[in-house]
């Protein structure tokens, strides 16, 4: 019998992920299963609106970035080894391009990642889950 590896991402990506470039901003390795993602506007609040996809599934739909975070949490425990998070600009706000700060909290570690997206380019983060043995 042959082993079939589970696909990292769901089989059919939405058009917004295939018709724009998905620019890899950062790759993070995590041994902790609990991941928390918070998204804020970077700088001036200018009505930037984003969507966030986790392995091709929309998890934040047309969220408006401001000083209060848009929050998404997930557990890597039973899921794919690689977790692809893609930030999509739904508009450019009043001051293009669409800019965001993504704060990724893994265990006690916190990382701030600066993201830029527009109508041609999405921002991608990959979190590789590698549990301690």
Language-model segments: residues:
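Terminal leader/tail segments of proteins
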Residues: 1-133
């Amino acid at each position: 019998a042959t082993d079939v590896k589970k696909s990292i991402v769901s089989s059919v990506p939405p058009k917004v992920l295939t018709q724009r470039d998905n620019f890899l901003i950062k790759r993070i390795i995590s041994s902790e299963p609990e991941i928390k993602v918070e998204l804020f506007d970077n700088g001036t609040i200018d009505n930037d609106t984003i969507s966030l996809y986790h392995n091709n599934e929309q998890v934040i739909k047309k969220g408006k970035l401001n000083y209060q975070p848009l929050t998404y949490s997930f557990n890597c425990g039973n899921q794919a080894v690689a977790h692809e998070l893609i930030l999509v600009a739904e508009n450019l706000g009043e001051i293009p391009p669409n800019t965001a700060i993504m704060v990724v909290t893994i265990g006690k570690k916190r990382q701030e990642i600066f993201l830029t997206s527009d109508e041609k380019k999405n921002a991608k983060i990959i979190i590789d889950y590698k549990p301690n043995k």
